[in-house]
Swiss-Prot record:
Its EC number is 2.8.1.6. Belongs to the radical SAM superfamily. Biotin synthase family. Catalyzes the conversion of dethiobiotin (DTB) to biotin by the insertion of a sulfur atom into dethiobiotin via a radical-based mechanism. The lineage of its organism: Bacteria, Bacillati, Cyanobacteriota, Cyanophyceae, Nostocales. The keyword 4Fe-4S applies. [2Fe-2S] cluster binds at residues 100, 132, 192, 264. Residues 41-269 form the Radical SAM core domain. GO terms for molecular function: 2 iron, 2 sulfur cluster binding; 4 iron, 4 sulfur cluster binding; biotin synthase activity; iron ion binding. This is Biotin synthase. Keywords: 2Fe-2S, 4Fe-4S, Biotin biosynthesis, Iron, Iron-sulfur, Metal-binding, S-adenosyl-L-methionine, Transferase. Pathway: Cofactor biosynthesis; biotin biosynthesis; biotin from 7,8-diaminononanoate: step 2/2. CDD domains: Radical_SAM.
Length: 335
């Protein structure tokens, strides 16, 4: 099987064969693809701002923000615009090129809160930063409003395969997620979509999720690979840790089947050592979340701080990527 070609007709068996490639050979192939399509010295550093925290009505089994579980998360109302702008300004000074605004909503509603989010998007975009939002389900009209406000990307993760999905979430369907992604794809806003490792899924579930993403034309602009952090009070609090080599395999496979996408080493990164993260970067990860306040990610896991990340990047000979230093996705035929 040749690698390094952009294609949208991946079969599960092909992706499984990539995933099962002997580890060092897999890393080598993924690194080769990465160097073909990306600057291997650059890492995009992102900042997540939880603009509305907790009290989510959904039952995602991994999430501490669900109102159905007894966790330590304290609900927080929608932040005011000035607070968000100040956080974004500080992040930009640290070298961050993308700000992701997350709200614990099931879906976006056409009300004053959405209007406030649109203002946040516009103001932070005007600072020269890429802005990504993750707000739940989205209609086509709402996607167009976000596009008009200047939104660069919309995050809506698949989480896992369509077959395993109902084991983890029952309050929205897999089809609901795909519909939101399609609504975004009808605009010039790019798609950010990935999944979570450690939910109890099989390797075939991981492969199936990647196939769903890799058969989108164009591929998602970015693909977050999250590692489950077992949050006390959630149904998945006793799940075993994901082996780091599973994370590396998933990153490498995503890099090979979606060569132009950013592969984001996302939630759960704080548990990885610098050596383990270096293997992830070798395998094709080229984006991370960083913070100066140890605030939680959307799955409520601590995020490494800017200083530690800058030290690591310096050690590895890597640098922070400026905003929008990558081409916009284009629709192509299979080659």
């Amino acid at each position: 099987m040749s690698v390094g070609r952009i294609r949208y007709d991946w079969h599960k068996a092909e992706i499984r064969a990539v995933y099962d490639t002997p580890l060092l050979e897999l890393i080598y192939q993924a690194a080769s693809v990465h160097r073909q399509f990306h600057n291997p010295k650059q890492i995009q550093v992102c900042k997540l701002i939880s603009i509305k925290t907790g009290a989510c009505p959904e039952d995602c089994s991994y999430c501490a923000q669900s109102s159905r579980y007894q966790t330590e998360v304290k609900p927080q109302a929608l932040l005011d615009k000035q607070t968000v702008v100040e956080i974004a300004q500080n992040a930009k000074q640290k070298g961050v090129s993308r700000v992701c605004m997350g709200a614990a909503w099931r879906e976006v509603r056409d009300n004053s809160q959405f209007d406030r989010v649109l203002e946040m998007v516009k103001d932070v975009t005007d600072m020269g930063l890429e802005v990504c939002c993750t707000l739940g389900m989205l209609t086509s009209e709402q996607a167009k409003k976000l596009e008009t406000a200047g939104l660069y990307a919309y995050n809506h993760n698949l989480d896992t395969s369509s077959d395993y999905y109902s084991t983890i979430i029952t309050t929205r369907t897999y089809g609901d997620r795909l519909n939101t992604i399609e609504n975004v794809r009808q605009t010039n806003v790019t798609v950010c979509s990935g999944g979570i490792l450690g939910l109890g899924e099989s390797i075939d579930d991981r492969v199936a999720m990647l196939q769903t993403l890799a058969t989108l034309n164009p591929h998602p602009e970015s693909v977050p690979i999250n590692i489950l952090s077992q949050v006390e009070g959630t149904p998945l609090e006793d799940q075993p840790d994901v082996p780091v080599w599973d994370v590396v395999r998933m990153i490498a496979t995503a890099r090979i089947v979606m060569p132009t996408s950013d592969v984001r080493l996302s939630a759960g990164r704080a548990r990885l050592s610098q050596v383990e993260q270096a293997f992830c970067f070798m395998a094709g990860a080229n984006s991370i979340f960083s913070s100066d306040d140890n605030k939680m990610l959307t799955v409520t896991t601590p995020c490494p701080d800017y200083d530690a990340d800058q030290e690591m990047l310096n050690l590895l000979g890597l640098e922070m990527r400026p905003p929008s230093q990558r081409p916009q996705p284009v629709v192509m035929g299979n080659s």
